[in-house]
């Protein structure tokens, strides 16, 4: 018995602490699934040993104590929690328990709705005016948050229509839609501020601000799900009551449906679960409520929950596990990404053993170490990620995560430029992890323009070991190429000829083909026109590179380090030795570049020349050609069927040219 008492005390202490973190601090340290497991264990233990159950047990409480920073509000009708089911069998048992309670055979109609992952609130309307808003708190007493709730645009300050009770309490969930959450976190990251772990924390933290102006700046939403005070005047159907609230201006989830029996509930569950990732908000399950209010009243309540409702929880999207190691992968663009190797855990419907740690900043932000107990999240098809560390469970032998100084694939130095979050391998033309993409880019039509060298051929050449760097292309022969899939003798000869023809190019094309990070066609053209020769460019300092039009500090450093990386130098020399050449560039006078400093945008269909030809012609005259219209745009060239870019240009008062006007300008 002593072991049972000890476990009961331990469960109570853990649940009280975790509940305090969740409800009061808005900073949970364990996932919901862990809390649910402990609560179920406590309920089973107290069912087997009723003498252990006391009024202070977490099994008869809803949440934590209210924050002392807010005025406390006592709920006239308690805001209870819900019991949970986790399977079809448990759902059927829930329905049978209600029949047993009623002592008669009843066919239940259920009001089914998504279980939003936000913060439960109570809204009190007197004579149709919002006079008070409060959090659920511990179910009996909550915190007054009226001024903050008034800032939520989805919540009406005055009820619409007529017929509402003199005093009406609306209950619902304040939540943060996924899009708003992601945008808010992106803004916080850019400003170097702390980000929220998930939308639920964000909603709770936003609503419990002492300064309502902060709440007003957060993208909060609200769905009503029930009625407290005044509900007795609204008819005998829960679904009908919700629709009455909708008529009075309260928003409802569009997913709320009526279903018959446990089978109908299960079908609703399966449908919502399948669409979970598509919904614009986070949910962690669905809720079933007996629709008939007289049956609700007859079934009544237990200490912490109604007997006539239950939550059907989805597979947890967050779980706890151990971080066993960290490995570093190199992507096709050279990004070095830390990958967490986890003790396998079932989360989000699958067994997860790997999770992304993104970059060094994320590791520092999380404060994660090898050996830590971590919370891993998997939502839909999103790559699993570590969202928090359970620091209280950190072992004494936990080890810091050290970023490599050399590429784990090719051994080249890794670099992280100031202002960038990503660490990258500097061996862009050499690194095996980047090989296929580097060669595809090199041979592309806008680069070296190797006709017939498609992506699938490049992949075969690399997989068979025939090509390791772009320079190897120029030593291929027809016999080697003819051995590839779907490559006959004639096609092989044509490709050899195309590769040979690509030796003759231009300096801007060659620079673009090298795949230097952030160096597009326009920047390559500016570099070529500024330095005139490859030798001069290779000798340039960062300061000299900054003198080039549209080259900032980041691009200058990318170019500088790329041209000094030993492996890249080897490939560069091999390319020149293979006979790649271009005509000399003559220094252009200012009179030859009438569009210098001007930004053009092309839109619609051009009939007399291709988009690329028009772009090249404008760039040759000194213009910058951008892809989108902004206040910095000088001229929009509008071809046939010009769309939104033309509308925006007209709104901004930007000069608009027809194709005919473009031709006249190009001809001088």
Swiss-Prot record:
Reaction equation(s) it catalyzes: NAD(+) + (deoxyribonucleotide)n-3'-hydroxyl + 5'-phospho-(deoxyribonucleotide)m = (deoxyribonucleotide)n+m + AMP + beta-nicotinamide D-nucleotide
Active-site residue numbers: 115 (n6-amp-lysine intermediate)
Gene Ontology MF annotations: DNA binding; DNA ligase (NAD+) activity; metal ion binding
InterPro entries noted in UniProt: BRCT_dom, BRCT_dom_sf, DisA/LigA_HHH, DNA_ligase, DNA_ligase_AS, DNA_ligase_CS, DNAligase_adenylation, DNAligase_N
Disulfide bond sites: none
Sites where the protein binds Zn(2+): 407, 410, 425, 431
Residue span(s) of domain BRCT: 590-668
Gene Ontology biological process: DNA repair; DNA replication
Binding annotation for NAD(+): 32-36, 81-82, 113, 136, 173, 289, 313
Entry EC no(s): 6.5.1.2
Pfam families: BRCT, DNA_ligase_aden, DNA_ligase_OB, DNA_ligase_ZBD, HHH_2, HHH_5, Nlig-Ia
Top-level division of the source organism's lineage: Bacteria
Keyword field: DNA damage, DNA repair, DNA replication, Ligase, Magnesium, Manganese, Metal-binding, NAD, Zinc
Cofactor(s) this protein requires: Mg(2+); Mn(2+)
GO cellular component: a single term: cytosol
Signal peptide segment: none
UniProt xrefs under NCBIfam families: dnlj, PRK07956.1
Role description: DNA ligase that catalyzes the formation of phosphodiester linkages between 5'-phosphoryl and 3'-hydroxyl groups in double-stranded DNA using NAD as a coenzyme and as the energy source for the reaction. It is essential for DNA replication and repair of damaged DNA.
Family from the record: Belongs to the NAD-dependent DNA ligase family. LigA subfamily.
PANTHER family in UniProt: CHROMOSOME TRANSMISSION FIDELITY FACTOR 18 (PTHR23389), DNA LIGASE (PTHR23389:SF9)
Designated name of the protein: DNA ligase
Organism: Aeromonas hydrophila subsp. hydrophila (strain ATCC 7966 / DSM 30187 / BCRC 13018 / CCUG 14551 / JCM 1027 / KCTC 2358 / NCIMB 9240 / NCTC 8049)
């Amino acid at each position: 018995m002593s072991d049972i008492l000890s476990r009961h005390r331990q469960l109570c202490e853990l649940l009280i602490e975790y509940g305090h973190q969740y409800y009061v601090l808005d900073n949970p340290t364990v996932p919901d699934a862990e809390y649910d497991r402990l609560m179920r264990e406590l309920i089973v233990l107290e069912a087997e040993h009723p003498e252990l159950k006391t009024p202070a047990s977490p099994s008869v409480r809803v949440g934590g104590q209210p924050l002392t920073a807010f005025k406390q509000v006592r709920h006239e009708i308690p805001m209870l929690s819900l019991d949970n089911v986790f399977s079809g069998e448990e759902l059927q048992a829930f329905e049978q328990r209600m029949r047993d309670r009623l002592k008669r055979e009843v066919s239940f109609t259920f009001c089914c709705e998504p279980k939003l992952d936000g913060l439960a609130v109570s809204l009190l309307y007197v004579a149709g005016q919002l006079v008070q808003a409060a959090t659920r708190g511990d179910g009996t007493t909550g915190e007054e948050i009226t001024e903050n709730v008034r800032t939520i645009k989805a919540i009406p300050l005055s009820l619409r229509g007529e017929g509402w009770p003199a005093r009406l309490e609306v209950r619902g969930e304040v939540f943060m839609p996924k899009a708003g959450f992601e945008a808010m976190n992106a803004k916080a990251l850019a400003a170097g501020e702390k980000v929220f772990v998930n939308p639920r924390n964000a909603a709770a933290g936003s609503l419990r601000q002492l300064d309502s102006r902060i709440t007003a700046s957060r993208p909060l939403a609200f769905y009503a799900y029930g009625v407290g005070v005044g509900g007795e005047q609204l008819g005998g159907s829960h679904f009908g009551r919700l629709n009455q609230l909708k008529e009075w201006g309260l928003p409802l989830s569009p997913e709320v449906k009526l279903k018959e029996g446990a089978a109908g509930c299960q079908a609703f569950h399966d449908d919502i679960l399948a669409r979970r990732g598509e919904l614009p908000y986070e949910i962690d399950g669905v809720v079933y409520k007996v629709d008939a209010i007289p049956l609700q009243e007859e079934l009544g309540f237990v200490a912490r929950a109604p007997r006539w409702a239950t939550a059907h929880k989805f597979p947890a999207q967050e779980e706890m596990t151990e971080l066993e190691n960290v490995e570093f992968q190199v992507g096709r663009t050279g990004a070095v990404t830390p990958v967490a190797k986890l003790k396998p855990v079932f989360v989000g419907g699958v067994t997860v053993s790997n999770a992304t740690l993104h970059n060094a900043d994320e590791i520092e932000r999380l404060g994660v170490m090898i050996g830590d107990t971590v919370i891993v999240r998997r939502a839909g098809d999103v790559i699993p990620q570590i969202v928090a560390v359970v620091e209280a469970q950190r072992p004494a032998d936990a080890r810091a995560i050290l970023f490599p100084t050399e590429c784990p694939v090719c051994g080249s130095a890794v670099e992280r430029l100031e202002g960038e979050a990503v660490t990258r391998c500097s061996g862009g033309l050499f690194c095996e992890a980047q090989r296929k993409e580097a060669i595809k880019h090199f041979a592309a039509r806008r680069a070296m323009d190797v006709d017939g060298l498609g992506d699938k051929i490049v992949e075969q050449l690399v997989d068979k070991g025939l090509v390791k760097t772009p320079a190897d292309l120029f030593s291929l022969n027809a016999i080697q190429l003819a051995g590839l899939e779907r490559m006959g003798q004639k096609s092989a000869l044509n490709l050899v000829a195309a590769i040979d023809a690509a030796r003759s190019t231009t300096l801007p094309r060659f620079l673009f083909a090298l795949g230097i990070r952030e160096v597009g066609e326009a920047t390559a053209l500016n570099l070529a026109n500024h330095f005139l020769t490859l030798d001069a460019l290779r000798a340039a300092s960062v300061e000299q590179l900054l003198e080039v039009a549209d080259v900032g500090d980041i691009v200058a450093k990318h170019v500088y380090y790329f041209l000094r990386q030993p492996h890249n130098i080897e490939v560069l020399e091999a390319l020149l030795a293979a006979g790649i050449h271009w005509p000399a560039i003559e220094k252009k006078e200012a009179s030859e570049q009438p569009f210098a400093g001007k930004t053009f945008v092309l839109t619609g269909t051009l009939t007399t020349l291709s988009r690329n030809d028009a772009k090249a012609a404008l760039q040759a005259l000194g213009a910058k050609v951008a892809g989108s219209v902004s206040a910095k745009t000088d001229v929009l060239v509008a071809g046939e069927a010009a769309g939104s870019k033309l509308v925006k240009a007209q709104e901004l008062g930007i000069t608009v040219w027809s194709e005919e006007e473009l031709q006249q300008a190009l001809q001088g």
